[in-house]
Curated annotation (Swiss-Prot):
Active-site residues, as the UniProt record annotates them: 22
Record-given protein name: L-fucose mutarotase
Reaction it catalyzes: alpha-L-fucose = beta-L-fucose
Family: Belongs to the RbsD / FucU family. FucU mutarotase subfamily.
Length: 144
């Protein structure tokens, strides 16, 4: 255990966040996401909701300032419903952790899958919300 590190962050996830460079993306996926068929670098965070993971990750993570939206979510498939509280919950978690909310855009389901394949890693969470997946694009970490 380390002081100042959120207990939701496993050693494997901390290592992954540290390895990522600017422009790299990480997927925080719900329990329904086909992580293992889309990606080789899959990290388990069973039982931990994505809003908790966002509260844990975002204080350690610089968002990419050179893109319009460093946050990406999946749109509901036509004819399906999406709980608007999911996006609100995620943005509130980020706001609570870092004091602001970066821009967010939504991708069609298969565009999201294509983007997820290119990510640095996929974190499978305990999130049960339908379409509860989010991609975060890492920015340049300022040197203090």
């Amino acid at each position: 255990m380390l002081k100042g590190i959120h207990p939701a962050l496993s050693p494997e996830l901390l290592k992954t966040l540290a390895e990522m460079g600017h422009g790299d993306e990480i997927v925080l996926a719900d329990t329904h996401f086909p992580a293992h068929s889309l990606h080789k670098n899959v990290i388990r965070a069973d039982g931990i909701s994505i809003d908790i993971l966002l509260e844990a990750i975002t204080p350690l993570f610089e968002f990419d300032a050179y893109v319009d939206a460093p946050l990406l979510m999946m749109k509901a498939v036509e004819g399906d419903s999406l709980d608007p509280n999911v996006e609100t919950r995620y943005l509130n978690a980020i706001e609570s952790a870092v004091g602001f909310t970066p821009n967010l855009t939504c991708l069609e389901r298969f565009d999201f899958y294509t983007r997820a394949k290119q990510a640095y890693a996929v974190v499978v969470s305990g999130e049960i919300a339908k379409y509860g997946n989010i991609i975060i694009k890492k920015g340049v970490t300022p040197i203090l």
